[in-house]
Regions:
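Carbohydrate-binding surfaces of carbohydrate-active enzymes
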Residues: 115-129, 136-144, 150-151, 155, ...
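Aromatic- and acidic-residue-enriched carbohydrate-binding clefts of CAZyme catalytic domains
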Residues: 5, 42, 47-55, 60, ...
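Short beta-strands within extracellular/lumenal beta-sheet-rich domains
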Residues: 376-385, 495-507, 541-543
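N-terminal carbohydrate-binding accessory modules
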Residues: 1-38, 69, 509
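Aromatic-lined ligand-binding clefts that engage carbohydrates, nucleic acids, or primary amines
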Residues: 391-406, 434, 504-527, 534-535, ...
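Short hydrophobic beta-strand segments in globular cytosolic domains
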Residues: 7, 412-413, 531-532
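Substrate-binding/catalytic cleft of secreted carbohydrate-active enzymes
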Residues: 80, 84-117, 125-268
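Aromatic-lined substrate-binding rim segments of carbohydrate-active enzymes
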Residues: 24-91, 172-177
Length: 585
């Protein structure tokens, strides 16, 4: 019911954290033109608590109030999904990485240190959004408690069901205490309602295409009545590095949409518009077979609205079905944002090892993790000097997640948690240096392994089964800001990690897609914005560069290339993204 009248919610998911703030109105207009009347969004805790006790609710796309106002301006209802656990293919499922450092803390369970931290977050959030609730004349009509908790209950049978329920009830109570006074809901696969439902919250189903089963299951756990909603209806799917790009047919999505419309079932497309995992925000899955499955930078999701905000055949198919069903007017489709194709010359290079020489390392007898070093993301360089020669098989069982190995600055190989490669042959001469540059590819965001999320080298290194201890020098390389070009310059050294610097002039701005297919692995900054990771293995071969991050006149680019097997001289912007090209090595 809305203002005393029955309403069917036709919602689409779009995460404000994955879309540049200047594009929020455009994307919301696109969703309205698709026939939707609501937008759902996660709130990712770690997106707003950027360091312990430091909160950002105002800058750029951190401005949640600004997003809620934009939704209200566009006449869209809002479904808020604040977690505290979100999943969403986002780094650590939205949890701040430093929770792992708190003594006695166990995440996602009835644990006092964890609940105390959750309460601080929820109170911070409530202060930002409670005036935007529909009860106060705002656009927020529903709020979710936790997320897919039934899956976690099913995976963590070592915890008694009553303990799980005690935790989820505590989260609901925190939301109430914080001032949320609108309908609350949970979302789970319908077969997982037993562990996921919370008294006082509407159970909604994820991925449920059988309307009769939806109604039967909701009735079972909600006093024999609805309303009925599919909180995550998947028109596409998530994507991992080194795996094929996932696609779902437009016809299948349109037919399922019509089923929901005809049955009076409310639904939320997850995703209607996916956006981008800018910076180091992408998460990862875990399987026993693949160990870790890091998500690509693009969160296109094969959604009806593409990563760059374009109409797709799926958009047209859904729009057509909804227009035939609803009584309200569906507006015209907004114009596409212009595209440019710049050629960016890279004028200068400097080697990472040259920069490191001026830094002060942490000295340690044992290997330290990112968390030990108080670093959340980016890279870590482990260095050790050997006074005696040593050769043999080097075993690094705790590699998290990708590493390049060097002896006296020469690359000798790679280690890769994705492929299970944790060993390689090394030969370190007398009085020589071993370097291991480790990259965090994103913390696991789903499943029981979310509790095992340390990064760096997490177990001892051995060479010929002998543990290598003592005299480690450890350098943090967070890359949390765009590097400033130093006065020094370095000649190209094949295989060494290198920073490429360039400036370029524009007489007009627009979106573009940086072609990274000739590069190896790394990240790209433009005008201070980390566009995210690229990796030659694919399937993603281009990086989305929104035009709102560019300026008329001079622009600055920095590329951190980890593998550096070929010297690069330019970056090329192309007019079409490439997200589905795997490269088998």
């Amino acid at each position: 019911m809305y203002d005393g009248k029955p309403i069917q919610i036709h919602s689409g998911e779009m995460h404000y954290s994955r879309v540049p703030a200047p594009y929020w109105h455009h994307r919301l207009k696109m969703m309205k033109a698709m026939g939707l009347n609501a937008v759902a969004t996660y709130v990712f805790w770690n997106f707003h608590e950027t360091a312990p006790g430091k909160w950002d609710w105002t800058t750029d796309n951190h401005n949640l109030k600004g997003f809620l106002k934009a939704a209200s301006d566009e006449g869209m209802m809002v479904i808020l999904r604040p977690g505290p656990y979100a999943c969403g293919e986002w780094e650590f499922g939205g949890y701040p990485w430093w929770l792992q450092k708190v003594k006695g803390m166990e995440i996602r369970t009835y644990n006092k240190p964890f609940l105390d931290s959750c309460r601080v977050y929820i109170n911070q959030l409530a202060a930002q959004v409670k005036d935007f609730q529909v009860t106060n004349g705002g656009p927020i009509v529903m709020v979710q408690a936790e997320n897919e908790f039934g899956s976690y209950v099913d995976q963590r049978k070592d915890i008694p069901l009553e303990a799980h329920r005690k935790y989820s009830a505590a989260i609901r109570q925190m939301l109430l205490d914080g001032g949320f006074n609108i309908p609350m809901f949970t979302s789970d696969g319908s077969w997982l309602f037993k562990g996921g439902t919370i008294e006082g919250a509407l159970p909604t189903a994820n991925g449920e295409d059988n309307v009769d089963n939806l109604k039967k299951t909701v009735n079972q756990y909600h006093g024999g009545v609805g309303p009925y909603m599919v909180a995550e209806f998947y028109p596409g799917w998530l994507d991992h590095w080194n795996e094929p790009f996932q696609k779902v047919s437009a016809d299948r999505v349109a037919k399922q949409t019509k089923k929901y419309l005809d049955a009076g079932v409310s639904f939320n497309f997850y995703m209607a518009h996916g956006g981008t995992n800018f910076g180091f925000t992408s998460g990862a899955n875990y399987t026993n077979a693949r160990n870790i499955q890091p998500d690509i930078t693009s969160y296109d999701y094969d959604a009806p609205i593409s990563e760059a905000g374009w109409v797709t055949p799926k958009f047209d198919a859904v729009r057509s079905v909804i227009k035939q069903s609803v009584k309200y007017a569906v507006p015209a489709v907004p114009q596409r944002i212009p595209v440019i194709t710049p050629i960016i010359k890279l004028q200068n290079t400097v080697g990472l090892f040259d920069i490191i020489e001026s830094e002060n390392p942490v000295e340690s007898d044992t290997l330290l993790t990112f968390e030990d070093m108080n670093q959340g993301n980016g890279y870590m360089l482990y260095r050790r000097r050997f006074n005696q020669p040593i050769s043999g098989m080097m075993h690094v069982p705790g590699i998290a997640d990708f590493a390049t190995v060097y002896v006296n600055g020469e690359k000798v190989g790679e280690l890769n948690r994705l492929t299970g490669k944790d060993s390689l042959q090394v030969s370190v001469p007398f009085n020589s240096t071993l370097d291991i540059l480790v990259e965090n590819l994103g913390r696991i965001n789903y499943g029981a392994r979310i509790n095992s999320n340390l990064k760096g080298i997490t177990e001892p290194i051995t060479i010929n089964d002998n543990e290598i201890t003592g005299n480690w020098q450890i350098y943090g390389v967070p890359m949390d800001k765009m590097p400033v070009m130093p006065k020094m310059r370095s000649p190209y050294v094949k295989g060494q990690p290198t920073l490429y610097f360039g400036t370029f002039e524009l007489d007009k701005v627009g979106d573009t897609f940086l072609d990274m297919e000739k590069w190896g692995k790394g990240i790209v900054f433009v005008n201070g914005v980390n566009l995210g990771r690229y990796w030659k293995v694919g399937p993603q071969q281009t990086l989305y560069l929104p035009g709102c991050y560019l300026h008329k006149g001079q622009n600055t680019v920095v590329v951190f290339e980890q593998l550096n097997d070929e010297k690069q001289t330019e970056l090329v912007g192309v007019d079409t993204p490439v997200l589905d090209r795997l490269v088998k090595e």
